[in-house]
Design a protein with these regions (language model features):
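Conserved N-terminal subdomain of the carbohydrate kinase-like
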Residues: 1-75
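Anion (oxyanion) recognition and catalysis
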Residues: 9, 88, 92-96, 126
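Hydrophobic beta-strand scaffold residues
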Residues: 15, 101-102, 133
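Active-site beta-loop-alpha junctions enriched in small/polar residues
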Residues: 46, 75, 106-110, 137, ...
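Short, flexible loop segments at the rims of nucleotide/cofactor-binding pockets, characterized by
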Residues: 46-51, 78-80, 108-113, 157-160
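Active-site glycine-rich loop that binds ribose-phosphate moieties when present
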Residues: 51-59, 85-91, 116-121, 162-166
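Conserved phosphate/ATP/ADP-binding segment of small-molecule kinases
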Residues: 97, 111-204
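Short pre-catalytic strand/loop immediately N-terminal to key active-site residues, enriched for Gly-Thr
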Residues: 206-209
């Protein structure tokens, strides 16, 4: 843990508010693919610090008092009820202080193991977001919002723009605070070769890199 803190400090990232708790740090393993076998990611988060966070152990007002932007990921509330509760508190404090809030839905079904589904927890969190990042699969599995006439070519890494725009419009209608939606689109050519692009919708126009 100390080595990770030192690495962050070396990049001039503030580490004053880092807390050490739980039994260990969460780990992500990447199994690199070969030829046409895709790469796989394995999340090892059980008993990690954030999964075992204690209620009210973080002073969000102190942490966010000088912040201009707060970003959270859907992986955090997936780990435990306490993690979900603290995530909600952080969002609420950020809203109160006028801090821009963004989220990456980042739905990982195998992480939701404490008795609640993402569809039960995520809506209350996303309600406080100004920018939402998520693809059409995230929106359908978590919020039940289905794209219209979906047509994506993963080989070329392209997407039917009107399809993604329809998802954005439905998300913004459900979560009025959200003013922008973004998604990254990866196209798999083979295990070691991918295309990558970003798409942003601002409520009026769709932009693609």
């Amino acid at each position: 843990a100390e080595r990770c803190v030192m690495e962050l400090r070396g990049h001039r990232v503030g580490v004053d508010h880092i807390q050490r708790s739980g039994k260990r740090m969460g780990i992500l393993y990447l199994e690199t693919g070969s030829n046409m076998r895709p790469s796989k990611v394995f999340y090892d988060r059980e008993y990690s610090s954030i999964a075992m966070i204690e209620p009210d152990s973080i002073n969000w007002y102190e942490i966010l008092k000088d912040a201009i932007w707060f970003n959270w990921t859907g992986i955090t509330p997936a780990l435990s009820q306490n993690a979900a509760d603290e995530c909600l508190k952080a969002i609420q404090v950020a809203n109160e202080l006028g801090v821009t809030v963004s989220c990456d839905i980042n739905y990982r079904g195998n992480l939701w193991n404490y008795g609640k589904d993402a569809s039960e927890v995520m809506p209350a969190l996303v309600e406080g977001c100004d920018l939402i990042m998520g693809n059409e699969e995230d929106c359908e599995k978590v919020f039940g919002i289905k794209p219209k006439n979906f047509d994506a070519d993963n080989t070329k890494g392209s997407i039917n723009q009107s399809t993604f725009e329809s998802v954005c419009q439905q998300m913004m209608a459900r979560f009025p605070r959200c003013k922008k939606m973004a998604v990254t689109l990866r196209g798999a050519i083979n295990a070691n070769h991918n295309t990558w692009c970003g798409i942003l919708y601002d409520g009026k126009q769709l932009y693609q890199s």
